[in-house]
């Protein structure tokens, strides 16, 4: 089996899936205490890196995604599949798991 080199540009989500670069989690508390990796909350905010073509409707047409590349989004805490590319964390999830676009 041939090895596949993954990068953001080689990942193309299918259907209504969205590929999101996860924002960095907080390194310390408001009081200045440094947090170990095991105590950090899983981030729920990230930037859309890739978007699928959209959900297929019953008549065969596609429903265009509501988010686009570069949008900053808030998504469900335990949604999707976590993917690590190099030192960056990504999550691949369905568009329905995106709660809001953040400006």
UniProtKB/Swiss-Prot annotation:
- List the record's Gene Ontology CC terms alphabetically: cytoplasm
What's the chief localization of this chain? cytoplasm
Q: Set out the biological process GO terms recorded for this chain's protein.
A: chaperone cofactor-dependent protein refolding
Assembly state and interactors? Heptamer of 7 subunits arranged in a ring. Interacts with the chaperonin GroEL.
What does the record give as the function of this protein? Answer: Together with the chaperonin GroEL, plays an essential role in assisting protein folding. The GroEL-GroES system forms a nano-cage that allows encapsulation of the non-native substrate proteins and provides a physical environment optimized to promote and accelerate protein folding. GroES binds to the apical surface of the GroEL ring, thereby capping the opening of the GroEL channel.
**What is the annotated localization of this protein?**
Cytoplasm
Q: Supply the InterPro entries for this chain.
A: Chaperonin_GroES, Chaperonin_GroES_sf, Chaprnonin_Cpn10_CS, GroES-like_sf
Q: Which residues form the signal peptide?
A: none
Q: Does the keyword Cytoplasm apply?
A: yes
Q: Which family does it belong to?
A: Belongs to the GroES chaperonin family.
Q: Which UniProt keywords apply?
A: Chaperone, Cytoplasm
Organismal lineage: Bacteria, Bacillati, Cyanobacteriota, Cyanophyceae, Synechococcales
**Gene Ontology MF annotations:** ATP binding; metal ion binding; protein folding chaperone; protein-folding chaperone binding; unfolded protein binding
Superkingdom assignment = Bacteria
Q: What is the protein name given in its UniProt record?
A: Co-chaperonin GroES
